[in-house]
Amino acid sequence: THPEEFALPTLKVEATLRDYQETGVKWMSMLHRYGFGGILADDMGLGKTLQTIAFLSSQLKKETNVLILAPSSLIYNWLDEFAKFAPEMDVAVIYGLKPVRDNLIAEGHQVMITSYASFRQDVEEYSQLNFDYLFLDEAQVMKNAQTKIAHHLRNFEVKNTFALSGTPIENNLGELWSIFQIVLPGLLPSKKNFLKLPAETVARFIKPFVMRRKKEDVL
C-alpha cells in the first residue's frame, strides 16, 4: 500500500496540515498498522514535530505511553509544540537534577520528553515503564553504533520506534545502519555486508521505511 492511499486517521490537533504533512501522518500510521517503525527525514522546517504530534493525537488512548528523546536544546521546543497543537495531551519534560527527574518519571505522564544525556542516566527508571512509542529526534545522534546511548536504545523494549532526522541520512550508510538497528532491528544485513551493497539495493531495502521530502519539492 502507498501512504497516499492509506486513510488519514482522525487527528486531534489544533492545526491545518499541508498535503505533504498529511502524507507523512498517513505513512506513520501505515507503518504502525503493520508493526513497523520508520525514519521521517524531511528537510528542516517542514514540520516533522507537527507530523509526529498529529500522528500521536490519532493513536493515543488513556493507557498509551510515549517517550521522546531529543538533544537538550530541543526538548522545550517539543513541549511548546505540544502546548500549541495538542494542549489536551498530558506532556512533561523530564529534565533537571536526578531527584527532580526521578519524581517526574514517577508521576507517569502520558508523553515524556527528555534529552539523550538524561535518558542515558535514567535508563533503568525508563526500562521499568511500558512505552508504546519511542521517538528519536535528530536521530543522527546515534550515528556511531558503539555509543552508550545506541547500546541502551537497542536493548530498550518498546512497541514502536520512529526516528526523525533533518539531514539526508542516505548519504552515510554507517549512520543509516546504526539508526535502523534501533528503529527496525533485524531488517538490514550485518554492517559489514550492508556497507558493501550497491546503492540501488540499499535504496530498495530502506525505501518503505524512510520518508524524505525536500523543501523545494513541497513548498
Model-identified regions with their sequence ranges:
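ASCE P-loop NTPase motor core, strongest for the SF2 helicase catalytic module
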Residues: 1-219
